[in-house]
A protein has these predicted regions:
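Active-site nucleotide/adenylate-binding loops and adjacent lid/helix of ATP-dependent enzymes
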Residues: 2-16, 44, 100-188
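Phosphate-binding site of ATP-dependent enzymes
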Residues: 160-241, 267-272
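Short beta-strand-to-turn element immediately C-terminal to the catalytic PLP-Schiff-base lysine
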Residues: 124, 152-158, 194-196, 263, ...
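ATP-binding N-terminal substructure of ATP-dependent carboxylate-amine bond-forming enzymes
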Residues: 1-96, 100-102, 106-109, 113, ...
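Glycine-rich phosphate/pyrophosphate-binding beta-alpha loops
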Residues: 71, 149, 208, 277-290
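Short, flexible, mixed-charge acidic loops at enzyme active sites
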Residues: 79-84, 211-219, 278
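Conserved metal-phosphate-binding beta-hairpin within the catalytic cores
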Residues: 183, 247-282, 292
Length: 293
């Protein structure tokens, strides 16, 4: 699909926006993608995703759909299934890979048995947090099926959530019924883009304050991107190999971005894959375009 976009003049529908927690990021991604496609000669129709999107696509009959959606329903297999039923070609991963990768626990169940190192942990009900910690502190709470670090919190002994977490505590996880609780891994935040079957590079993400949350990802100046990351050669190679192996094992296509934590004190054994993103951001601050340059 990437080669087709590069070598042919097409009518491309860019799906963006929608109603997920990542709507604004998707609109920014979509606008940038549409502008880039027009620069290389394609005819582009921008579509802000709504529940009439199938009718709109049938009206314009594009040659291909560029999926610039993030979160539900554009990243979880729903839109992919619709496009399959309509017989429309589209970018990025298909229904099955998208449905698996959006579910962090299901992804772990598939990749960990293949020897891809991932953190332990388990799914908990958010209401149960008030009865006691699901893991020894520090630990990470994250929604099972959200991206862009939406709803992520690090719970430490020094956190202001209380011990156990108080019912009055205001945490970013509160809008979600189910959460994935994982041990906190000290060290570096890394990411690897895979594009058309090739791992591109390893970037270290260095937040200027706090951790690499939603604001740090999408606010200029809050995160330093070091590409290539300053790592031992064997860690760089391992991260790229793990990202490509995960991409292939899940059946992904086009572009993905795999996120890691790396604890230098543990050496190579301290490298953990956190998740695979099948709809990576394409904003001016996003990592896949940066690594692809």
């Amino acid at each position: 699909m990437t080669a087709q976009l590069a070598n042919s003049k097409l009518h491309v529908a860019v799906l963006m926006g929608g109603w997920s927690n990542e709507r604004e990021v998707s609109l920014t991604s979509g606008a940038g993608i549409a502008a880039a496609l027009r620069r290389i000669g394609h005819t582009v129709t921008e579509i802000d995703m709504d529940r009439d999107v199938a009718l709109r696509l049938r009206e314009i009959a594009p040659d291909v759909v560029f999926n610039a959606l993030h979160g539900t329903p554009g990243e979880d297999g729903t839109v992919q299934g619709m496009l399959d039923l309509m017989g429309l070609k589209y970018t990025h991963s298909g229904l099955t890979a998208s449905a698996i990768a959006i579910d962090k626990q299901l992804t772990k169940a598939i990749l960990a048995p293949l020897g891809i190192r991932m953190p332990g942990g388990h799914v908990v009900k958010s209401a149960s947090l008030h009865d006691g910690d699901p893991l020894p502190r520090p630990y990470v709470l994250k929604p099972v099926n959200e991206g862009s670090s939406v709803g992520v919190a690090i719970v430490t002994d020094a956190s202001n959530y209380g011990n156990p977490i108080a019912r009055s505590a205001e945490g970013p996880w509160q809008q979600f019924d189910e959460l994935l609780a994982e041990p906190f891994i000290a060290g570096k935040e890394l990411t690897v883009a895979v594009l058309d079957g090739e791992a591109l590079a390893v970037t270290e993400l260095i937040p200027t304050q706090g951790f690499y949350d939603y604001d740090a990802k999408y606010t200029d100046g809050l995160t330093v991107h070091q590409c290539p990351a300053d790592l031992p050669a064997d860690v760089t190679r391992a991260a790229m190999d793990m990202a490509l192996a995960a991409h292939n094992a899940l059946g992904c296509k086009g572009a993905t971005r795999s996120d890691f934590r790396y604890d230098p004190a543990q050496g190579l054994a301290g490298l953990y894959l956190l998740e695979v993103n099948t709809q990576p951001g394409m904003t001016p601050l996003s990592l896949v375009p940066e690594q692809a340059k």
